[in-house]
From Swiss-Prot:
<dbReference type="Pfam" id="PF04535">
    <property type="entry name" value="CASP_dom"/>
</dbReference>
<feature type="transmembrane region" description="Helical">
    <location>
        <begin position="47"/>
        <end position="67"/>
    </location>
</feature>
<feature type="transmembrane region" description="Helical">
    <location>
        <begin position="125"/>
        <end position="145"/>
    </location>
</feature>
<comment type="subunit">
    <text>Homodimer and heterodimers.</text>
</comment>
<dbReference type="InterPro" id="IPR006702">
    <property type="entry name" value="CASP_dom"/>
</dbReference>
<feature type="region of interest" description="Disordered">
    <location>
        <begin position="1"/>
        <end position="34"/>
    </location>
</feature>
<feature type="topological domain" description="Extracellular">
    <location>
        <begin position="68"/>
        <end position="84"/>
    </location>
</feature>
<feature type="transmembrane region" description="Helical">
    <location>
        <begin position="85"/>
        <end position="105"/>
    </location>
</feature>
<feature type="transmembrane region" description="Helical">
    <location>
        <begin position="157"/>
        <end position="177"/>
    </location>
</feature>
<keyword id="KW-1003">Cell membrane</keyword>
<keyword id="KW-0812">Transmembrane</keyword>
<comment type="similarity">
    <text>Belongs to the Casparian strip membrane proteins (CASP) family.</text>
</comment>
<feature type="topological domain" description="Cytoplasmic">
    <location>
        <begin position="1"/>
        <end position="46"/>
    </location>
</feature>
<keyword id="KW-0472">Membrane</keyword>
<dbReference type="GO" id="GO:0005886">
    <property type="term" value="C:plasma membrane"/>
</dbReference>
<feature type="topological domain" description="Extracellular">
    <location>
        <begin position="146"/>
        <end position="156"/>
    </location>
</feature>
<feature type="topological domain" description="Cytoplasmic">
    <location>
        <begin position="106"/>
        <end position="124"/>
    </location>
</feature>
Length: 188
């Protein structure tokens, strides 16, 4: 028999010793796998409402900052479409995350389990997209205003935009957790 790699041939004793070194999984290793899964699922159950609560906080702050951004003629958030968009999406995000947080902590089932998981996932995705869309639409306008002069109006707008971005990050994490729940949930 030829050896194309110029290696020494494998002997029967080498195969037997390798077989002895491998061991069958013990019942304890199966138990630890189940325990690890339970811990992971428990972490997901705790992390999802926490990230939604953080999103609620940042959305509410973005809303409050943008509403209070009125500093006279030409320095009113209501004069600019982009800032009104940030305000509207902050309101939507605040309402959505407040509803989700309330639904979680009240422990009441509004929908059946399958529908609830689908609403969580799709709602997180849609609202996260709206948040980043609103922030990215207002950033260029704020940069143009900052080139002219830097004042409290642009600082407030930049703060509201930053809070919307932080809300997006929190809700994007929540969407990951919702996606994990959706992918591991059996609908049988």
């Amino acid at each position: 028999m030829t050896n194309p790699d110029n290696m020494k041939p494998v002997e029967a004793t080498d195969v037997e010793s390798a077989a002895e070194k491998t061991s069958e999984p013990t019942p304890a290793s199966g138990t630890s796998t189940i325990t690890q899964r339970w811990k992971r699922e428990d972490l997901i159950k705790k992390a999802s409402p926490i990230t939604r609560g953080i999103c609620l906080l940042f959305s509410l702050i973005a809303f409050l900052i943008m509403v209070s951004n009125k500093h006279g003629y030409g320095r009113n958030f209501n004069d600019y479409e982009e800032y009104r968009y940030v305000l509207a999406i902050s309101i939507i995000s605040t309402l959505y995350t407040a509803w989700q947080t309330f639904a979680h902590f009240s422990k009441r089932e509004i929908f059946d389990r399958r529908t609830s998981i689908l609403v969580d996932f799709s709602g997180d995705q849609i609202v996260a997209y709206l948040l980043i869309s609103a922030a990215s639409s207002a950033i260029p306008l704020t940069n143009i205003f900052r080139e002219g002069q830097d004042n409290i109006f642009t600082d407030s707008a930049a703060s509201a935009i930053s809070m919307a971005i932080f809300a997006f990050i929190a809700l994007a994490l929540s969407a990951l957790f919702s996606g994990y729940k959706l992918s591991t949930h059996s609908f049988i």
